[in-house]
Design a protein with these regions (language model features):
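C-terminal-most transmembrane helix of multi-pass membrane proteins
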Residues: 2, 255-308
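Membrane-interface interhelical linkers
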Residues: 1-22, 55-82, 194-222, 232-242, ...
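Helix-helix packing/entry segments at the starts of transmembrane helices
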Residues: 107-112, 179, 183-194, 231-262
Length: 308
């Protein structure tokens, strides 16, 4: 009987990890849709439409007894609002980054997120961090310098947007760790969805651009639907497999980003950028591994790299 239970747990874990990989494929397709828009629509407007279509995922996210109103209900309104604001900043910055940068370069900078999480966890959660994780943070920043090559590489708004997006994502992760035991998952999801929706709508209205081609309409819808589908896959994955096991699969998103950037947009990769990306990924994976060692029974929240 115990053996059957263990086998069932393993089967669900494998299925959960597989769904997670699929989720990051879908997220990468959502990001590629932004790139395909080529800046035809303002970033705030893209975020608004993406969040609006993201509402389609809510029925799949709702737990037993959850209501639509629970998207707005919370115990700590101030932290809930900050969570929504961080999600909005991350969404807008990721759209700017994927519009202006090669996909692999944008992902490399966004994936500095685990380093930011370590720093914020020490400051706000008073989490003890040893020299190994601090070393990973330093190595991650070295990887960023290699990717950016200041003085040898023309820096764009997209580079700063990607770094800001990674920082905003780290704020979200730290807030989820802080609020995870006191708020319903649907409430936390609501903040991450309604924040970008409200900010995107408010800031896009003064210069609203109606998609005037079928191409633009298709890819703005693709951005939102793929984001919603990715959210659903990740929620189901999280219910089937421990988050600490699923978390490292997020780095597969960079591989898909490289493939899509090269195959669809003709992005060119040089060895310096690849080296920097490998260093950043290695630092992030090491951080996850150390968190699992220090807190083997804790839930490691997956960084929400995707804007939704």
């Amino acid at each position: 009987m115990q053996s059957a239970t263990v086998d069932e747990t393993r089967r669900r874990t494998v299925q959960g990890v597989a769904l997670s990989f699929l989720g990051y494929v879908v997220y990468a397709l959502s990001d590629a849709s932004v790139r395909e828009l080529h800046g035809a629509l303002p970033p705030f407007e893209v975020v608004f439409f993406g969040s609006l279509l993201g509402l389609l995922a809510v029925p799949f996210v709702r737990g037993k007894g959850d209501r639509w109103a629970d998207l707005l209900r919370c115990h700590d309104r101030r932290m809930w609002t900050i969570r929504g604001a961080a999600a909005a900043v991350g969404a807008v910055c990721s759209v700017v980054a994927f519009t202006q940068l090669p996909m692999a370069e944008a992902f490399a900078l966004l994936f500095l997120l685990p380093g930011f999480v370590t720093i914020l966890s020490v400051i706000f959660l008073k989490e003890p961090v040893g020299w190994r994780r601090w070393s990973a943070v330093v190595v991650g920043f070295i990887g960023v310098l290699i990717v950016l090559r200041p003085g040898f590489h023309v820096l764009k708004l997209g580079h700063f947007a990607a770094l800001t997006g990674g920082f905003a994502g780290a704020v979200t992760v730290v807030l989820l760790r802080h609020l995870g035991n006191s708020e319903k998952p649907i409430s936390l999801y609501g903040a991450g969805l309604l924040g970008p929706l409200a900010v995107g709508l408010a800031l896009s209205l003064p210069h609203f651009v109606v998609p005037n081609t079928v191409h633009d309409a298709i890819f703005i819808v693709s951005y939102g639907l793929m984001g919603a589908a990715g959210n659903i896959l990740m929620m189901v994955s999280g219910r089937m497999a421990p988050a600490s096991i699923v978390a490292p699969t997020q780095y597969s998103q960079m591989l898909w980003g490289i493939a899509l950037g090269y195959g669809l947009f003709g992005d060119r990769l040089d060895w310096v950028m690849i080296l920097g990306a490998i260093i950043i990924i290695g630092a992030g994976l090491f951080t996850f591994a150390r968190e699992k060692v220090k807190q083997p029974h804790a839930t490691t929240l997956r960084p929400p790299v995707h804007p939704q």
